[in-house]
């Protein structure tokens, strides 16, 4: 564990991101960096994930949100980034497509199930829920979560629940929870430039379609 390097990297990133920001924004962003450094000392975070959280947090701070990172929601769930502005609560969960060794033979299914699990479990704690990802990764979000809840069926929700429960079963998610779970936005987080692009979920779905259409066809998934 190289705490000095971790802190140096985050401070360098924070300084680069905030070079033209107000002093208030700078102070808040560096405070987030310090929180992440303390979590790194406890071996709770890694630099690649922390860099994405920092850049995302800075974008929300600039929009007037009061931001926290690695915030505990209940006894089990800790969200990556949460922002509060007035009565609005926004949660952003980072998803980079990491596949553990045990899922090496079914990486696409594992990634899709993890994305579904994050939307189902975290969105109920937020007024708006977003997934944060990198420009080099395309999120394979089941269209179920992009459709309005009124257009979903219990059969669809049951299918999603079966897939999620294979990988994640705590906290338990009901079919009713799934019907209400919504992905509102995708945050494309470019650490290199320290910029964040916010895309509404339906627009992202259309953008991703050309990339994912063949992939879904060969996997035998339902047409979108």
Pin down the residues of each PLM region:
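Acidic-basic catalytic patches of nuclease active cores, encompassing PD-(D/E)XK
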Residues: 15-72
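A structural signal for short, well-ordered beta-strand segments and their strand-loop junctions
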Residues: 68-69, 91-93, 130-133
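Residue-level "edge-of-site" marker
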Residues: 72-73, 135
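Catalytic cores of nucleic-acid endonucleases
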Residues: 96-153
């Amino acid at each position: 564990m190289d705490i000095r390097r971790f802190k140096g990297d985050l401070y360098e990133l924070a300084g680069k991101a905030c070079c033209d920001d107000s002093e208030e924004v700078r102070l808040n962003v560096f405070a987030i960096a310090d929180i992440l450094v303390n979590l790194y000392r406890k071996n709770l975070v890694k630099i690649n994930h922390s860099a994405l959280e920092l850049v995302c947090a800075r974008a929300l701070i600039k929009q007037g949100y009061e931001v926290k990172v690695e915030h505990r929601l209940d006894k089990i769930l800790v969200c990556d980034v949460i922002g509060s502005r007035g009565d609005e609560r926004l949660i952003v969960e980072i998803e980079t497509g990491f596949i553990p060794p045990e899922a090496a033979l079914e990486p696409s299914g594992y990634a899709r199930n993890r994305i579904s699990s994050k939307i189902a479990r975290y969105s109920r704690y937020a007024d708006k829920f977003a997934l944060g990802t990198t420009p080099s990764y395309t999120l394979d979000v089941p269209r179920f979560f992009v459709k309005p809840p009124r257009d979903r069926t219990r059969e669809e929700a049951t299918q999603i629940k079966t897939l999620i429960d294979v990988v994640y079963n705590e906290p338990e998610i009901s079919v009713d929870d799934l019907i209400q779970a919504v992905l509102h936005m995708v945050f494309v987080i470019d650490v290199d430039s320290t910029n964040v692009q916010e895309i509404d979920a339906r627009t992202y779905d259309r953008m991703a379609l050309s990339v994912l259409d063949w992939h879904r066809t060969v996997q035998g998934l339902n047409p979108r």
